Amino acid sequence: MINLILLGLPGAGKGTASEQIVDKYHLAHISTGDMFREAMANKTPVGLEAKSYIDKGDLVPDEVTAKLVEERLGQDDVKNGFILDGFPRTTNQAELLDEITTHLNKQLTNVIAIDVKEETLIDRLSARFMCKNCGATYNKFSKKPKVEGTCDRCGGHEFYQREDDKPEVVKNRLEVNEKMNAPLKEYYDKKGLLATVNGEQAPEKVFADIDAILSKD
């Protein structure tokens, strides 16, 4: 069984790699964002508790998020293993996750960090642009519209770049994320769970490296 966390800064390719891993290994892809939305929509006790913080503009306490993760890891589709997305983000959350996985007997088997240089990430993230009409997302390098200047989805001709995709904002966002990411990598390295792959490569090569790590165990 594979119980996995992928670590990496925004733009490192975690989303693409997650999809490829789920397709091959049939793992449950557990996203904390999706969990919050689902729990709040279904008005579960933990969902309502989380909503009370979000409605006030407060951060949801780690213990509440951990309850949500524990509920989700107890569901049937997790029997083949899981890949966690968006949790843990801090060492405190990592310790809570250890308690949960030990209690459920679903201990982590792998933590894989996708490493990409800051300048590459800035290039990737600041290359994003969107259709003004329908919000479809494109990338100057990897996902251009099929017809230049025309949105594939709605046929619109006006595009814009979000404020938080501008290079100086992206750089700041990456620095904030790295401050959170570095202690997590150290935490899992000490536990002997951490492996690192080179995220500068093409997505299929990144996946091949991840696949080699997962197949080995």
Swiss-Prot record:
Which terms does the UniProt entry file under GO BP?
AMP salvage
Q: Which family does it belong to?
A: Belongs to the adenylate kinase family.
Q: Where is this region: NMP?
A: 31-60
Q: Which residues make up the binding site for ATP? A: G11, A12, G13, K14, G15, T16, R128, T137, Y138, Q201
Instruction: Write out the GO cellular component annotations.
Output: cytoplasm
Q: Which GO terms fall under molecular function for this chain's record?
A: adenylate kinase activity; ATP binding; zinc ion binding
Q: Which residues bind AMP?
A: T32, R37, D58, L59, V60, G86, F87, P88, R89, Q93, R162, R173
Alphabetized UniProt keyword annotations = ATP-binding, Cytoplasm, Kinase, Metal-binding, Nucleotide biosynthesis, Nucleotide-binding, Transferase, Zinc
Protein's name in the database: Adenylate kinase
Residues at which Zn(2+) binds? C131, C134, C151, C154
Q: In which pathway does it act?
A: Purine metabolism; AMP biosynthesis via salvage pathway; AMP from ADP: step 1/1
Underlying gene: adk
| Record EC number | 2.7.4.3
Q: Which reaction does it catalyse?
A: AMP + ATP = 2 ADP
Q: What assembly does the database describe for this protein?
A: Monomer.
